Amino acid sequence: MTIDLTWAGWFTSIVVLYYAALFVVSLRRPGADTAPPGWESPLMIVVVPARNEEQVIGDTITNLRGLDYAGACRILVVDDASTDTTAALIAEHAAQDPRVRLLSRTAEQGGRGKSDVLNHAYRLIRDAALAGDPWLEGRGPSDIVYAIVDADGRLEKDSLSVVAPYFIDSSVGSTQVGVRIYNAGDSTLARMQDMEFVGFTYLVQIARDRIGSSGLGGNGQFTRLAALMTLGDSPWKMTALTEDLDLGLRLIEAGWRTRFCHHTTVAQQGLTKWRPLLRQRTRWIQGHYQCWSHIPRLARAKGASLAGRFDLVTYLFLVVTVVVISLSMTASVASSLGFVKITSSFLSFVPQGLPLRITSLVLSLLPLATFMLTYQKNSRHPYKWWEVPTFALVFSAYSYVWIVTTARAWTRMLLRRNGWVKTPRVGTVAASAASLELVS
């Protein structure tokens, strides 16, 4: 049996060149948006979902209370029916600082996933804003920004001040900040995740911001309340495994612009064990495939330029790159065992000998070299120069986790399993302006 892998070579090369183009675009980095004199900063409401987070929630709230922001800031921490001391720790901070509120969900309400928590808080804030609640200073939906920080998140001290001017443009619905891993120095696994986040931020997201296709993450996400209101009573879909990616795509479809701010970051705790990492990445892959349903609407979305729409569709589609690489590797192993014969006319136009070897080497090493250069330049934990080759190989080996998680995701999809987010239809959680005043 003979297998022709010419198509796989061309596909992989196109992907490499596409990301190389994004890297070139990202080299020109505009300065942060700045506010004109006299401009009133929006009211920032930082929402922190928390379920059994007693180990980290206290430090997170302390971090948020210490942020420098000339405008008004409120902190709404949602205890999702925790069974540990999370609620008590939040209540201590609420008693010390009037900007902090505790929203407690009952056992019947809790445990339905992050999307349900965010929707509960959203309805509470929306109704309070429409009612002119004094805790929100009477601000309207266009002047309120709903920020999401995970229970282990740490914003930089000036994050709110840096992000606020991005909302001067009334067409901007959401802004995402960069993500770092604050325990990157604790383990090699955590460092690999830091490389992923920093690399994605500075290699992809900056370029995507320039062409109008910035993506949203689940941590360090800032969204205008008025934009959320255009998505209905539950902006975060309960059935979405990657609710952040889904939300950003629907905002663009609704005509809003999404931005990316690389001038500040949110730090989060990296996973230090393989099992939860595999589970997390499997969910990401499966959620990515779920978002393919957005492709027809994105192709004609009003909230992005032609280049932005092309990038969004391409970004969603390129998740199949892992499948192509997996098939190529499987064929190569089968060939080495003598089961099949592999042929390929890829690079047949390049002269044999040294030119072919150089071309193959460049195509093989260009992605990794670009990624390592980006990380070294922008990381707060850069490697010593003599460590770079070793950890480049380690990162290459680590990247095979995507092959494993893609296989797991495909298995779950074939079995129609979407078990990370509970989706029983039990009705929405009631919220009112009056209830916001009672939360303390």
Please give the residue ranges for each predicted region.
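N-terminal membrane-anchoring/stem segments of glycan-assembly enzymes
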Residues: 1-40, 370-377, 402-415, 440
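N-terminal signal-anchor transmembrane helix
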Residues: 20-73
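Membrane-embedded multi-pass helical conduit in multi-pass membrane proteins
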Residues: 36-38, 316-415
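Acidic donor-binding segment of Leloir-type glycosyltransferases
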Residues: 62-111
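Long helical/loop segments within the catalytic core of UDP-sugar-dependent glycosyltransferases
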Residues: 101-107, 111-143, 157-240, 282-293
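Short aromatic/hydrophobic "clamp" motif used to bind/position activated sugar donors
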Residues: 146
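The conserved acidic donor/metal-binding loop of glycosyltransferases
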Residues: 150-154, 251
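Catalytic donor-sugar/metal-binding loop of nucleotide-sugar-dependent glycosyltransferases
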Residues: 245-266
